Amino acid sequence: MEPGGARLRLQRTEGLGGERERQPCGDGNTETHRAPDLVQWTRHMEAVKAQLLEQAQGQLRELLDRAMREAIQSYPSQDKPLPPPPPGSLSRTQEPSLGKQKVFIIRKSLLDELMEVQHFRTIYHMFIAGLCVFIISTLAIDFIDEGRLLLEFDLLIFSFGQLPLALVTWVPMFLSTLLAPYQALRLWARGTWTQATGLGCALLAAHAVVLCALPVHVAVEHQLPPASRCVLVFEQVRFLMKSYSFLREAVPGTLRARRGEGIQAPSFSSYLYFLFCPTLIYRETYPRTPYVRWNYVAKNFAQALGCVLYACFILGRLCVPVFANMSREPFSTRALVLSILHATLPGIFMLLLIFFAFLHCWLNAFAEMLRFGDRMFYRDWWNSTSFSNYYRTWNVVVHDWLYSYVYQDGLRLLGARARGVAMLGVFLVSAVAHEYIFCFVLGFFYPVMLILFLVIGGMLNFMMHDQRTGPAWNVLMWTMLFLGQGIQVSLYCQEWYARRHCPLPQATFWGLVTPRSWSCHT
């Protein structure tokens, strides 16, 4: 195609030159000399184009070969490949990807790629401008009301109160996670079967007690504020999920090693690295970047801190003035509906800030410090046209764990036809975990998240499936997100202040689990 096109262009050029030579004009000699120069320049550009295409093709081939090598190396060496599926097994009622495993490759986070586009960076700058507006409005209101220009961080100081106690509590949680699962695995690999099973199970039981009971006891006994409780509960859930992944991935290879199949047990250094790297799927090795960009680490930590300040300003200016005295007014459906609609804007802001601060900034900072190559912690969930796609792309780190150890293992136990049951199991585990986190952080039980996630979210997952495409479905998904966040912020804020305005004269079980905002209207 190229040589023929080049000859055709050259013939047209020469034809044009010939016509110009025959034209009776005064500068005919000039046109005669310019035609060979034009032909030579065209030939030179064709040669340059061919050279550039050849170089690009070679570089692309090298990149693809390297990606294939890294993908092959990222497969766990201690596991045998899964047998091929029997003929006819890939039906509509069965799961074709039963043996699919997480493959780690070097790739950047999606927002880092989008930040290279000036148009998207402008949206980022708009959010920074919004933070500046909150700061200016806070200073202006304080100056008008009290005659001083001083930013107060009372809400931030209260939320992170007793943080050193939470960090001290983290130490035994970490040591338990570091030592108990690995030592149990070593016992199963080397000791006699009866003795190893008993000691290993005892170690894991002690590990579970430390992780489950210690943070709850510290939070209740010392009445930790919400942000300090967040540190404990997130680390508690993270350590439990990482411990399970390590044992789930390493135990099959360890049992085969006992039978003399020559499979080595996981190294302690790989397990230690796994406890800090931003993934919940254990592998002996991960793709690594060649060096650490410390300016990138500092930038992400600074952005995470900015998101925390942003959230404090949103709560202090848009939520506290509205809900602080709501429980002291008579209940009305109109006030409840208006409070939910008022909370949609701060609710969606909080959702975006949590996403950006944790899933992008925090995880990327730790990934960069540990040279962890695979930065796909999320995908383009904002473009989702179905809730099933939203749940898969919002938090890829947790989704990979649920898909590998709840959904796929559920299919292995129940059969490939039980896709619906396995999916309901994923929703149940995720909803209970989210409700437990909210209960731990806020200090009371109010199953708003459980109902929204398990009931409403489960229904929307089956109703708004992947076959729903088009802009209208994306608008509908965002509308449901706005309303859901408004319901959560409104109801949880009302319950928070109701429990402070109407304390129980005597603590009872039903008094602790019954929402106080339903009856506290003084």
UniProtKB/Swiss-Prot annotation:
Descriptive protein name: Sterol O-acyltransferase 2
Effect of residue 242 to R: In K-null mutant; does not affect ubiquitination and sterol-regulated stabilization
Region (Disordered): 1-36, 74-96
Compartments it resides in: Endoplasmic reticulum membrane
Record's keyword terms, sorted: Acyltransferase, Cholesterol metabolism, Endoplasmic reticulum, Lipid metabolism, Membrane, Oxidation, Steroid metabolism, Sterol metabolism, Thioester bond, Transferase, Transmembrane, Transmembrane helix, Ubl conjugation
Binding site for cholesterol: 119
Catalytic activity: a sterol + a long-chain fatty acyl-CoA = a long-chain 3-hydroxysterol ester + CoA; cholesterol + an acyl-CoA = a cholesterol ester + CoA; cholesterol + (9Z)-octadecenoyl-CoA = cholesteryl (9Z-octadecenoate) + CoA; (5Z,8Z,11Z,14Z,17Z)-eicosapentaenoyl-CoA + cholesterol = (5Z,8Z,11Z,14Z,17Z-eicosapentaenoyl)-cholesterol + CoA
Lineage: Eukaryota, Metazoa, Chordata, Craniata, Vertebrata
Source taxon at top rank: Eukaryota
Topological domains, Cytoplasmic: 1-120, 189-196, 253-293, 370-417, 465-470
One of the GO biological process terms: cholesterol metabolic process
Post-translational modification: Polyubiquitinated by AMFR/gp78 at Cys-277, leading to its degradation when the lipid levels are low. Association with AMFR/gp78 is mediated via interaction with INSIG1. High concentration of cholesterol and fatty acid results in Cys-277 oxidation, preventing ubiquitination at the same site, resulting in protein stabilization. Oxidized at Cys-277: high concentration of cholesterol and fatty acid induce reactive oxygen species, which oxidizes Cys-277, preventing ubiquitination at the same site, and resulting in protein stabilization.
Annotated gene: SOAT2
Annotated InterPro entries: MBOAT_fam, Oat_ACAT_DAG_ARE, Sterol_acyltranf_meta
Residues engaged in binding an acyl-CoA: 389, 392, 395, 399, 407, 430
UniProt note: domains: Each protomer consists of 9 transmembrane segments, which enclose a cytosolic tunnel and a transmembrane tunnel that converge at the predicted catalytic site: acyl-CoA enters the active site through the cytosolic tunnel, whereas cholesterol enters from the side through the transmembrane tunnel.
